[in-house]
Amino acid sequence: MKRHILAVLAVLPTATLVAQTSPLRVSGFIDTYYAWDDGRPTNIDRAFTTQAARHSEFNINLAHVELLLSQPNVRGRLALQAGTSVQSNYAGEPSNGSVSGASLARHLQEAVVGVRLTDKLWLDGGIMLSHIGSESWISRDNPTYTRSLIAEYSPYYQSGAKLTWSPTDKVTALITVVNGWQNISETNADKSVGARVDWTLSPNLAVGYYMLYGNERPNDAPSESRTFNGATVKWTPSDAVQIVTTADVGSEDGSTWWGGALVGRWVVRPGLALAARWEEYHDRDQVLIATGAGAFRVSGASLGVDRTLREGVQWRTEVKRLSGKDAVFPDRNELSRTNLLLVTSLALSW
């Protein structure tokens, strides 16, 4: 994989020169960060997150280089990646056989090929970013630097095929068949199915619904369906203000988990923005979040300040506090009901 990354980097200067006359475009993103967790984890790994995952350590949250192909009837994206969020996200990637597992999968953020079947219908296949939720893996594209709990505990990526239908410029619908809940390698003989519908009601208001259904148990365990549904509303009352609310609910084997987030972003002036988030997440039976202690029933709030220092350079700082009904957050060698994070990031896009 290292040889593959070096090969891509070697062609970047040439590719950049022809980008303006070619359907192939090269771009990239580097997100550096420093995070302070008041729990001061002894192994430096922060709990219950993949973003800014290391305490008191300068590191790379996500760095990727991408090749994008855009033609009238063919499209594709190849993105190679590294960073602590990558290490965290692929830690649970199953290893089944000799050519699977996190060490093989984690450096591919996306490797997807798309072909237009009709004027309004596309077929895409490969490793792709998830169709779930309202937040991106790439922090630059989110109103807050850190992701909400509902985004952290829903799939970041998936491997499969999808059909995307855009009957009008205001409605987009897709159906997808994937290997499972955030896994490239298979865990059983079944596939999961998902769907999403996005509808732009007006220039200021858009809504979306998404779902995923499948058996996530290994072959040697009894089959049990996981059902997941979510919805999001994005309201942009002005060029300077955006409000996004998202809610998810899932169930498996008689247990239910749910969560929600309300995010607001205000552009104070060009180059300066403020963002705030309230969130809630309840996984009483620890279906997705194993605490090793009490149930994960947590609420939280965050406040962020974003500065654009130069074209393509963004400095983001966020403070986030989480509070649980039970003591679940590591606090040195004990557990606490609260967790406080201060993180600052310097990112480059090109």
Task: Walk through the language-model features, giving the residues of each.
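Residues on the lipid-exposed face of transmembrane beta-strands in outer-membrane beta-barrel proteins
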Residues: 28, 56, 60-69, 110-115, ...
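Cleavable N-terminal export/targeting peptides
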Residues: 1-22
